[in-house]
């Protein structure tokens, strides 16, 4: 068959898309000088020299297309080591719980996904790193971005929840180490942050950030078991809840709120003139009866400029001295209030300043037996221990370090995306 009737399609892969090009062939002419050009064979990504009259492309177009085709050497796949990475190889301490009955302090590591057990006397004033007694971590644990923690001294159990991605509460026994499976796993609403046990009620309360709820479960709930009751609604005062305590003696639930609220769904948002908009309010600490359910209004609210609340995180209750302690992440401080405070009230004590060693406080815990206050630093690879009544710009009694002093903390908080600023040549990582 002549070249006039011999036409072949050529497929060219560019950026993973196959573009079919059909180009008509030229008539063979003996008076025309013979020229050669190139064709791309899609099966091999190779260039082959062909004579005029065969299927061909202009050389300028061909060169551009050839440059866009990845070579076999440039294709990456399999178990490949990255060129470089930004990561924190040390623990980032999140929440803390003290158990004087068993002489234990338990902390969660949000960075590498684990639970750390320390002796209650751990720490020193040197630059030495303090190794944990036990460290639960590994794929079998199911832990991811670990947040709140609570301990049951009688049953020697530790409870923790995954924030943002795991949507699970996991329960482990004391004194286990390594890559171990949890005793129990409970599915919880998305965005769980804080935990609070009430052993008298045999219940555990969980603060859920995004839908602005507090869910109360049986202590031993597991699987897909539903909560016994839920506090939620436009009048409940729950606005991005984080820290939570369950006051067994007063039968109250206390919650630290960042101040952001939005309707959970269309039904709650309403329609037309009855639409309820989202809002940004000042941070607060709200209190509820232990049996509160639904859109229950708080019985008390600590809120206002005098409170100095600024991104309140973890909370701890000192029932013996009628005080509540709050980790105030926004200005690297710890605030202490009377348990029954209400309104725009100033804290009883404030620990803040360069000497305190507080940097990105995420969790707090009161040890009334040893008269001490524990604070976990999310941005400093450390936990600092103060006298319970410490105030002002005061140095801690002890420091529990998991990295040498001055080691920078990457500060990732479950990054969900990445972008590159070509003007400033910076990598942007929203958390």
Predicted regions and their residues:
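N-terminal Sec-pathway targeting helices
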Residues: 2-16
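A short beta-strand motif characteristic of beta-propeller blades
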Residues: 81-87, 132-139, 181-186, 227-234, ...
